[in-house]
Amino acid sequence: MVEFTKRLLLERNFERTNRPITGPIVVHAVAGAGKSSVINTVSLTFQLICWTTLPEEKASFNCLHLRHLDGPAFPGAFVDEYQLADTDLSEAAFLFGDPLQYPGPAAQVPHFVKLFSHRCGLNSASLIRELGIAFEASKLDSVQHLDPYSSDPEGTILAFEPEVQAALASHSLDFLCLDEFRGKQWPVCTLYVSTKNLCDLDRPSVYVALTRHYERLLIMSFDAADTSA
């Protein structure tokens, strides 16, 4: 099973790093890279129970044999979002994670990594790289920066800043907060933020918000009309 998974990772264009393999094999992937697909393929092929540090209902993929990890990892276990674990993972076979999306104290140097997203497009990738994040894509997508006072939202509405959420709620606008949209995806999203300078915001939250769409993203910045900036 371990060799099968290693071959599968290489077939799915995960790159082997120069870290020697000792202990659990650590796999890092950006949002939309296909990490969940690898786990699901292994689970279905071997009828393997896979584990996640997240509550099962918040897991980023549907897996018939997915369970929440609430103790030390079992020998040979496959653990998703391992970096959030506060328990012993030394007996696991594979540790999967996206530390950019779920920062955690247990993050390790990976044995395999994939920086290419099949979900996001070129415009999104360029915006994400401005945050100092290595991120690649090849398909076309649309990213628009708009004035929230003169433009209407489309698709799923996202907001992670408390003051922005309060403003949207005051206008009876339905939106999803970070815990609700993390791990999910939609064709079109509208992201409301306090400033067009995304580098000034919490980087993990921005990263998650910028990687929820797979066709089109509208970014509504409340300082968009401020010409003094």
Curated annotation (Swiss-Prot):
GO terms for biological process: symbiont-mediated suppression of host innate immune response; transport of virus in host, cell to cell. It is found in: Host cytoplasm. GO terms for molecular function: ATP binding; RNA binding. Residues 1-114 form the (+)RNA virus helicase ATP-binding domain. Keywords: Host cytoplasm, Host-virus interaction, Inhibition of host innate immune response by virus, RNA-binding, Suppressor of RNA silencing, Transport, Viral immunoevasion, Viral movement protein. Pfam families: Viral_helicase1. GO terms for cellular component: host cell cytoplasm. Residues 115-229 form the (+)RNA virus helicase C-terminal domain. Transports viral genome to neighboring plant cells directly through plasmosdesmata, without any budding. The movement protein allows efficient cell to cell propagation, by bypassing the host cell wall barrier. Increases plasmodesma size exclusion limit. Acts as a suppressor of RNA-mediated gene silencing, also known as post-transcriptional gene silencing (PTGS), a mechanism of plant viral defense that limits the accumulation of viral RNAs. TGBp1, TGBp2 and TGBp3 seem to act together for cell-to-cell propagation. TGBp1 is the main movement protein that physically cross the plasmodesma with the viral genome. TGBp2 and TGBp3 would facilitate TGBp1 function. Belongs to the Tymovirales TGBp1 protein family. Homodimer and homooligomer. Interacts with capsid protein. Interacts with host AGO1; this interaction targets the host protein for degradation, thereby suppressing the antiviral RNA silencing. This is Movement and silencing protein TGBp1. The lineage of its organism: Viruses, Riboviria, Orthornavirae, Kitrinoviricota, Alsuviricetes.
